[in-house]
Amino acid sequence: MDGRAAGADGVEIPGRYRHAVVPHIMVEDAAAAIDFYRRAFGAREDFRIDAPGGGVLHAEIAVGRSVLMLGDVSVDEAEAGSFAAPAALGGGTSVTLHVFVPDVDSLAERAEAAGAEVLQPPTDMFHGDRTVILKDPSGHLWVFLTHLEDVPEEELRRRLAAAG
């Protein structure tokens, strides 16, 4: 199947993507973002196409076992006209990227040292995960989690109610 994998639903997925849903984020400076993701999150750059006039047209990085696509908004906006980086949206974003990691505490330290803003320090949560919420220098929100325990639905609801 030439590098392709069939998902559970029979859809062919190019082998490098591993999942049917592949987030694609827009940033003001993709080269700097890739460097930050490498230093902060241990990401690996797998693919990159630079635009003829400068900037990154398209890049793919591996974060854990998942792929994230990204590119410079200034390069892509001429084509689609509707892409925007968080800064163009007043600093907000409607998407958070959740990533499970073996040690959320060490990741939080490394990410903060690399320039991430810690919005919520590592905290044991009612849903059974230790979680940190970070904002990267491009304005995207990341939630990193270390799974601590499986929590049955009834217990999850009880804990949520008790938390107020």
Feature annotation, model-predicted:
Residues E28-A31:
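Hydrophobic ligand-binding cavity/cleft-lining segments
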